[in-house]
Amino acid sequence: MANTLFDRTIAFAGICQAASLVQKMAKDGHCDQEAFDTAIQSILETNPSNTVAVYGKESNLRIGLECLVRDFDNTPSGSELTRYLISLMALERKLAGHRDGMSKLGERIGTIERQLEHFDIHDEQMLSNIASIYLDVISPMGPRIQVTGTPSVLQQPMTQHKVRALLLSGIRSAVLWRQVGGKRRHLIFGRKKMVEQAKIILARI
């Protein structure tokens, strides 16, 4: 895959979208269904032809692109999103240096793909299986991501499955970010360029 500003912007928008959906799901118990489906589908796209193919099409990343453009302010909501982003990228770095973890992740995703021949991806059992990949493979690498939200919402098993599945999709996008050459310096010094690129994409979708 190409290491261009466009590719980095798409991948980073994927991480932003996952973080934004986690925040919404944890507070309200629901989020944009199309964006959620895009996130889950991205986990299964293990051999994409290009960066956009991970998400299907550019318009499937509208929430993430808007989140990227809006920037993260110092409000509690903005600080929370920033924390999720930093945590996801830190976990991906641990995963990248853990060959066994990457191998296990690939095996577990392969199992999900086989199960999808018989079950719908929206079934509670399937979402539970996807969530368990995050719990079993990613979470033990630490540091643990503390998800904050509405306690009564977060206590519901289905919400927990969806939040963990979304966190796994965030890791998927962070892996993609690294694959297309994304580095910390791009976030510090190249953020303005990514915002401009995101605006261009948003204008055409």
Swiss-Prot record:
Name the keywords, alphabetized: Cell inner membrane, Cell membrane, Cytoplasm, Membrane
Q: Which GO terms describe its cellular component?
A: cytoplasm; plasma membrane
Q: Which Pfam families match?
A: DUF489
Q: Which InterPro entries match?
A: HflD, HflD-like_sf
Please classify the protein's predominant subcellular localization into one broad category: cytoplasm
Q: Where are the transmembrane segments?
A: none
Topological type in the membrane: Peripheral membrane protein
The family assignment reads: Belongs to the HflD family.
Q: How is this protein named in the record?
A: High frequency lysogenization protein HflD homolog
Q: What gene is this protein a product of?
A: hflD
